Amino acid sequence: MEELFKERKEKLNIIKNLLRKPKEEKKATNNTSNIPEGLYTKCPECEQGFLSEDVQKNFYVCPGCGHHFKITATDRIQMLVDKDSFREITHRLKTQNVLGFPNYTQKLSHLEKTTGLNDAVVTGVAKVGGYRVVIGVMDSRFLMGSMGSVVGEKITRAIEYATKRRLPLLIFSASGGARMQEGIVSLMQMAKTSNALAKHNAAGLLYISYFTHPTTGGVTASFASLGDIMLA
């Protein structure tokens, strides 16, 4: 315990010492250039700085002003499900540039490397409070969470998985809507996901839909608005 407090104190001292520098010196060092990556988080609303682990423990809500930080799909899953219970499904599906949209393939490749995701949603099976559930979490870092063929397919398969095994379904939406680079193919996903949810509903199963920032366009007009319970 003593070592833990010592390590925490050292981290806080690094931040305090840098923040105490004269303005000219701060500017020269670009404010946070000497802070180890991932240690420090600055709130865009109140501009206060905090240890990243404190922000994480506060569920990504600013301890100073209550601002809600954006949450990655991976972080949200870790926050929500029982420890070590999540198992990803349909993770091998990858988007193809079927319409030959300019620079789309390059964008996908770049985002895969920077986010560690293969598209804008992560789906899987997990336990929440000991109960088995199927969960889908969108990530706005990947092309603003837009819904293309792979996103629509992954969500549809997750719904079908839940229906077949008679499991409740949780989906966290964070999307700018249908993906323009896939044209009519992306719009088809609205009908496909809605149809799968109709069957899940007909089986008398629970679907809880969570609207997170941002949730707009074709996602709002399809699966996001079809929950038995909807939270925002």
Segments (PLM) and residue ranges:
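Terminal-region recognition feature
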Residues: 1-208, 214
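Gly/Ser-rich catalytic serine loop of serine hydrolases
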Residues: 212-222
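Gly/Pro- and small hydrophobic-enriched strand-loop and loop-to-helix capping segments
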Residues: 227-232
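Short, solvent-exposed amphipathic alpha-helical segments in soluble enzyme
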Residues: 152, 225-226
